[in-house]
Amino acid sequence: MIEPPASGTGLTRRNVLFAGLAAGAGVFGIPRRVWSGPAAETRVVGPLRDSVMKGPLVWDVRALGYESQEYLVSGFADVLRPVSMADAPSIFSRNSTADFAVRDFKLHLISPARPYTTRLVVYRPRDLRKFSGRVIVETLHPFGGGRGLLWNAVHSFFMASGDAYIGVQHPLTFPALRSEDSARYGTLRSSDPTQLWGMLIDAGRLVKRGEVDSPLHGYAVERLLMTGYSFTGVATATFANYYHDRARMPGGGNIFDAYLPMADAQYVRPLDVPVMRLNTQSDFNGFGGLHNRRPDDPRYRHYEVAGACHVAAAPPADAAVPPRIASLPTPAGQPKFSADACEKEFPAGAVSNDFPLYLFQESMFANMYAWLDAGAPPPHSRYIETTTDGAARLDVHGNALGGVRYPEVSVPVARYGIDATGDCVLFGYKVPFSQTACRRLYGSREHYLARVHRAAGRLARQRLLTEPGVDRLAAIAGADANF
């Protein structure tokens, strides 16, 4: 439910009605009919001129038959009491262990219908006939001023699949954009970070309506999938928990048809649409994550990837050109990470963790598409095994037991360590085996690669790896082999 402000905060009869009809549920017996009408007061400006050259954090995807565009969307969104790091002015103001464990999803209205203007970054096929009908929606991560972490990791797969992608700018990043180009972004505004939720609702409904003001007008939009990683994984899980039932199309249908929150430890409640969660070995047991696991059910899958760390390796470069302006100042209240400082905690001989998490992420999206389009249930998987104190149980090589097991840990030539302290646990490392150890385990490079290929083939048959991923995984293993 949504709760009104305490007395003395200016709650008028109009605001009470707004709280019941447009921002929450059942206050004073008013039925839950939340954000269900047309976004009549949403205004769209764009596409902005020359987005590839002028838009910070915008990729050039022309060589892949796609186009990049920016839009400014204005509307009205409630200011609410924050419920997670994703809508707080500072992540340090939140108790994430408590936030992630919440099972009672109340909202507390502070001020209704405050104006906002946000930026949408849109990637879409130039040829409408190649559009899949699917739109991936991701909150842009405040770190670095607004990065699409799933776009960065999986854009090759999205474009090969014909998907459109929309990144919604987080309110915390508006000052950096205005400072970068005041003429272009001077109208960006927000009263409070909690307006993010209204921005996501308006953007989703705008795209799904498909009317002339939509950034995807003329595209036959069928499904919207919300995803995110790390901070924006929290945003995805938070939206699913608090807003999925409250955010509706004019006819009462869902705005979002699926959720894929990744690299966050947050509980996600049962919904009427499919949900897939992913946690790396860095994330599965942090912030109370072990208590926020939920058994698979007909609309839910939970994956934990042994050996993978939170700060994941980038995929190989493709024809997409990274942004000309690749970073803006990170807002205050966000963590400041130093890879160099964390590497000093790694043991002798360790190098950065290079686990190809993007390959498993591709399989998640492929399985979600089959689930939505053909009703094909995704595979189940085991949890990472734990000791009595909640740490990952390790095998004889020092790698985690259980979970989704890629050849990095099932046919290992390195130890994948996720045991640094503090924030450095997000980075992870690997300690390559000596040549002597590799030869003792596998005999020869050829025997090792044959075992990797068999392991990758099993993963593909289990649908935990895409078919094209088999050869890619074998090539990665070949580069790592020390024989």
Where do the PLM segments sit?
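N-terminal secretory signal peptides
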Residues: 1-11, 19-24
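C-terminal segment of classical bacterial N-terminal signal peptides
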Residues: 27-33
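Generic low-complexity segments that are intrinsically disordered, proline-rich and/or Lys/Arg-biased
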Residues: 5-6, 32, 39
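C-terminal His-loop and adjacent cap/lid subdomain of alpha/beta-hydrolase
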Residues: 35-483
